[in-house]
Amino acid sequence: MPPVDNAYKLRNQEYLQEYAQKPGVKIMFNGVMYREISKGSGPKPSPKSFVTVHYVGKLINGKIFDQTQKGRPATFRLNELITGWITAMREMPAGSRWEVVIPYNLGYGSRPAGAIKAFSTLIFDITLLDVR
């Protein structure tokens, strides 16, 4: 395993502290944070639900590491996603759009995952289109 980049880890922790102070931010029981961009009125998913979403995933420097293609949403079984997504999506009514901020321990953790460095805070813009 590569050595820990303590400066990067600290920047990610500072980002979480700053984000928590923004107006409209809600902090969930395990540290996942979100800001409601638009409110939906559909059902909330259960862990075994299939969710159809549009999303953009970014790091704290603004670099996009993953996203759905325009006009082509993605469908996932909720309980197969990272813990931070599961936590947020369980409270998100279909039709909603949220900005979700996930601490590293509820994302990809202390190990790198592709272009995502260890200890990365993940920022997602998620629109929940459908729950089945």
Write out the residue ranges for each language-model feature:
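Cross-family detector of peptidyl-prolyl cis-trans isomerase
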Residues: 1-132
